[in-house]
């Protein structure tokens, strides 16, 4: 349910962009993200840091997009969110407390080296997405950027999450099979 809730603002943004324009879509994105945070808090009594960072960035850069009638701000929002996530993971790694382990470590027992590898992999993923977003945003038409933002980055994140899951599975402690006596 929570994962579905995370996609609703993105779906609304895409639909309103296709029917109207980037400014209507951006206004709706701000409103939908605000409602999403409120509903998440009402249902779970907490809001995750990543969701709060995304909300603040949507409100800030979306607001600037609308106030200045300049779609460059909403384009930059995507890159800045990814850079913030990459920096957060980098800082957590340097401090010896990989954020990925903090998020998943209660459910999974893995060696510290594995957590470190996963953490650095996500740093690289977020950094790559940030750079790729800038390229698409400023070298291709707005329609292409919107499709990339909604479908390309979503698909890349899904694939990378699955790859991370496979890497985790490979390193999970497996109980030896017992022989029937």
UniProtKB/Swiss-Prot annotation:
Transmembrane parts of this sequence: 10-30, 50-70, 80-100, 120-140, 148-168
InterPro entries recorded: YciB
Keyword Transmembrane helix: yes
Recorded topology in the membrane: Multi-pass membrane protein
Pfam families to which the protein is assigned, alphabetical: IspA
Compartmental location: Cell inner membrane
Main localization (coarse): membrane
Keywords: Cell inner membrane, Cell membrane, Membrane, Transmembrane, Transmembrane helix
The organism's place on the tree of life at top rank: Bacteria
GO CC annotation, single: plasma membrane
Stated family: Belongs to the YciB family.
Classification via PANTHER family: INNER MEMBRANE-SPANNING PROTEIN YCIB, INTRACELLULAR SEPTATION PROTEIN A-RELATED
Stated role: Plays a role in cell envelope biogenesis, maintenance of cell envelope integrity and membrane homeostasis.
Protein name per its UniProtKB record: Inner membrane-spanning protein YciB
Species of provenance: Vibrio cholerae serotype O1 (strain ATCC 39315 / El Tor Inaba N16961)
Name of the gene: yciB
């Amino acid at each position: 349910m929570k994962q579905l809730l995370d996609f609703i603002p993105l779906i609304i943004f895409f639909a309103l962009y296709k029917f109207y324009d980037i400014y209507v879509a951006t206004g709706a994105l701000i409103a939908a993200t605000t409602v999403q945070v409120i509903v998440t808090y009402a249902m779970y009594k907490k809001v995750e840091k990543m969701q709060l960072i995304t909300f603040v960035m949507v409100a800030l850069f979306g607001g600037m997009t609308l106030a200045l009638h300049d779609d460059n701000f909403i384009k930059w929002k995507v890159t800045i969110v990814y850079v913030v996530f990459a920096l957060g993971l980098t800082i957590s790694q340097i401090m010896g407390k990989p954020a990925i382990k903090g998020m998943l470590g209660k459910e999974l027992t893995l060696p510290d080296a594995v957590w470190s590898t996963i953490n650095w992999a996500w740093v690289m993923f977020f950094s790559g997405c940030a750079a790729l977003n800038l390229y698409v945003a400023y070298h291709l038409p707005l329609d292409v950027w919107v499709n990339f933002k909604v479908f390309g980055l979503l698909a890349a994140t899904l694939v990378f999450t699955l790859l991370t899951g496979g890497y985790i599975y490979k390193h999970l402690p497996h109980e030896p099979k017992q022989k029937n006596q």
